[in-house]
């Protein structure tokens, strides 16, 4: 996830250049796999939305997806849960040391699964937080959105 405070360019909004605007941009940052989320990504998204919700000088949130994909140049908002890590027990948390390694072999990946968190992909908790946030959450959709990504788009304002 990326989390940025928007900054004025000082042109048409009558705000001096470089001054913080009351808007936060939160973006999925896994463009190579259409911004699919993993359990750690869902945790980060929850923390980002909650931080913006609790910051008094933030008036709105923009939720989007980074891109383009280095594989084919395509853009995506979010393709939902990363099916490559979904096991028989559900989605699997990985240890921090392997969570960003896209090329780790499946057998090696299994050694790093956090056993106490098997099956836990709590996107519903993020959706509840989005609905309870009194600030508008704008879904800026740059391309594909499917599965859980589509649900986030629908829940946004």
Describe the function of each predicted region.
Residues 15-16, 75, 129-130:
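Short secondary-structure boundary/capping segments
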Residues 122-157:
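Glycine-rich beta-to-alpha active-site loop
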Residues 42, 46, 120-127:
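Short, well-ordered alpha-helical scaffold segments within catalytic/effector domains
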Residues 1-71:
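Conserved CoA-thioester-binding segment of acyl-CoA-metabolizing enzymes
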Residues 26, 63, 82, 152-154:
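Hydrophobic/aromatic residues within transmembrane alpha-helices
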Residues 33, 65-125, 145:
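Glycine- (often His-adjacent) and acidic-residue-rich active-site loop
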């Amino acid at each position: 996830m990326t989390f940025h405070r928007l900054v004025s360019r000082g042109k048409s909004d009558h705000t001096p250049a470089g001054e913080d605007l009351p808007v936060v941009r939160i973006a999925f940052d896994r463009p190579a796999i259409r911004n699919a989320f993993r359990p750690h990504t869902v945790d980060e998204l929850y923390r980002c939305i909650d931080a913006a919700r609790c910051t008094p000088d933030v008036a709105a949130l923009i939720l989007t997806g980074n891109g383009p994909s280095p594989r084919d140049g395509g853009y995506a908002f979010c393709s939902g849960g990363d099916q490559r890590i979904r096991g028989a027990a559900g989605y699997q948390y990985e240890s921090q040391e392997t969570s960003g390694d896209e090329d780790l072999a499946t057998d090696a990946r299994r050694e790093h699964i956090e056993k106490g968190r098997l099956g836990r992909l709590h996107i519903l908790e993020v959706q509840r937080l989005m609905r309870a946030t009194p600030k508008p959450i704008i879904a800026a959709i740059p391309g594909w959105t499917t599965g859980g990504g589509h649900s986030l788009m629908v829940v946004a304002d």
